[in-house]
Amino acid sequence: MSAFSEAALEKKLSELSNSQQSVQTLSLWLIHHRKHSRPIVTVWERELRKAKPNRKLTFLYLANDVIQNSKRKGPEFTKDFAPVIVEAFKHVSSETDESCKKHLGRVLSIWEERSVYENDVLEQLKHALYGDKKARKRTYEQIKVDENENCSSLGSPSEPPQTLDLVRALQDLENAASGDAAVHQRIASLPVEVQEVSLLEKITDKESGERLSKMVEDACMLLADYNGRLAAEIDDRKQLTRMLADFLRCQKEALAEKEHKLEEYKRKLARVSLVRKELRARIQSLPDLSRLPNVTGSHMHLPFAGDIYSED
């Protein structure tokens, strides 16, 4: 991948489109350069505010993709986006229409469902998006309309994934957190003192207490990071399950279509074969003109009309 620079990032952000491929491509580039997460977030926020209203939502889609897909690599982006994400939500919400707010609400729901941020940050995001509005009362008819729309959207099948995307998702899971033997060993080797509250009574001086505190902090960081990676792996496996289901559905539909086509062409072959058989039989029943006498090439003289009708 190309080297990181703020100028390169600004250029890539200026070329960012609303397509899934564009967002995912830039997201992968950013995650690859995650050691520059702080300047990346700074440039992202600056360019977000400069972007036209119809492009601002795409910036948040990019942030969402980076935050969620970088979790298995490390917590850098989740932490560095946290101080600016609330104001970013507020800015985009104030600059765009209600349709855009619905999409922002969907992103927020996913973050809440997957515990991307702590509850206090999620509450701030809700306030930035919805303000102090209370749930408005709706008539029974309005509720039924919303339910029907939701059912319709949930029931509509997803687009099947490209084969390359499916292969990439499977390859990503080859290095999943659950297979990290080194971390498993580190967790298994944690001293019992960091896991049993009852053992705190054995601390008799400040020095040993501070030493244990350092061990507990390290254990917390190790376990929190690994839990985050496992949560990301679970999300990846859920996504892969959906991708496989969509792919299988698509293949079943394609199979049914091709079987139908095969039957159709079998019938056509049968009709053409019948024509060929009948044609061969008809050809066999016709006279062979090549066996008739060659009238034009012989020396036989045909009689003249006068000879035929002459009187004796």
UniProtKB/Swiss-Prot annotation:
The modification Phosphoserine is found at residues 153, 156, 285. InterPro entries: CID_dom, ENTH_VHS, RPRD1A/B_C, RPRD1A_CID. GO terms for biological process: RNA polymerase II promoter clearance. GO terms for cellular component: nucleus; transcription preinitiation complex. Keywords: Acetylation, Coiled coil, Nucleus, Phosphoprotein. The modification N-acetylserine is found at residue 2. It is found in: Nucleus. Residues 244-286 form a coiled coil. Residues 2-133 form the CID domain. CDD domains: CID_RPRD1A (cd17011). GO terms for molecular function: RNA polymerase II C-terminal domain binding. Belongs to the UPF0400 (RTT103) family. Interacts with phosphorylated C-terminal heptapeptide repeat domain (CTD) of the largest RNA polymerase II subunit POLR2A, and participates in dephosphorylation of the CTD by RPAP2. May act as a negative regulator of cyclin-D1 (CCND1) and cyclin-E (CCNE1) in the cell cycle. May form a heterodimer with RPRD1B. Associates with the RNA polymerase II subunit POLR2A (via CTD phosphorylated at 'Ser-2' and 'Ser-7' of the heptad repeats). This is Regulation of nuclear pre-mRNA domain-containing protein 1A. The gene is Rprd1a.
